[in-house]
Amino acid sequence: VLSPADKTNVKAAWEKVGGHAGDYGAEALERMFLSFPTTKTYFPHFDLSHGSSQVKGHGKKVGDALGNAVAHMDDLPGALSALSDLHAYKLRVDPVNFKLLSHCLLVTLASHHAADFTPAVHASLDKFLASVSTVLTSKYR
């Protein structure tokens, strides 16, 4: 459960992301594909090379979804219901991949906002991304 301090930290961190959410999403996806090559199996139709328009496009979707989640932190299940359905029933993504992408997102955010990435902000973002992952995998059960 996100505390009021966690919510404040997440909102402040996301404000600093600003218009870079899609770029950071794409960078996190690239990190994930390079660090965890098995994740590429869900994207057989994508050009996964650096700077690929398909990775950038999916990165924008990731960034937009996270922005929506930040805006609706008090109702993540409602905000992410359609996305949860898509990943559970149509795409059938292995739930562990959400944890891998979350880790890569944390690394990406830390690399771009090192001065602001305090231990408290890191912990809050980690809890937030874990909550998002839990919601996205809730329909697998």
UniProtKB/Swiss-Prot annotation:
Sequence positions that bind O2: H58
Binding site for heme b: H87
Subunit structure comment from the entry: Heterotetramer of two alpha chains and two beta chains.
Summary of the tissues where the protein is detected: Red blood cells.
PTM-bearing positions, type Phosphoserine: S3, S35, S49, S102, S124, S131, S138
Residues with PTM Phosphothreonine: T8, T108, T134, T137
Positions where N6-acetyllysine occurs in the chain: K16
Organism encoding this protein: Taphozous georgianus (Sharp-nosed tomb bat)
GO molecular function: haptoglobin binding; heme binding; iron ion binding; organic acid binding; oxygen binding; oxygen carrier activity; peroxidase activity
Modified residue annotations for Phosphotyrosine: Y24
UniProt entry keywords in alphabetical sequence: Acetylation, Heme, Iron, Metal-binding, Oxygen transport, Phosphoprotein, Transport
Highest taxon of the lineage: Eukaryota
Transmembrane segments: none
Gene3D superfamilies (UniProt xref): Globins
GO cellular-component term (any): hemoglobin complex
PROSITE patterns to which the protein is assigned, alphabetical: GLOBIN
Protein name: Hemoglobin subunit alpha
GO biological process annotation, one example: hydrogen peroxide catabolic process
General function of this protein: Involved in oxygen transport from the lung to the various peripheral tissues.
Family: Belongs to the globin family.
Residues of the Globin domain: 1-141
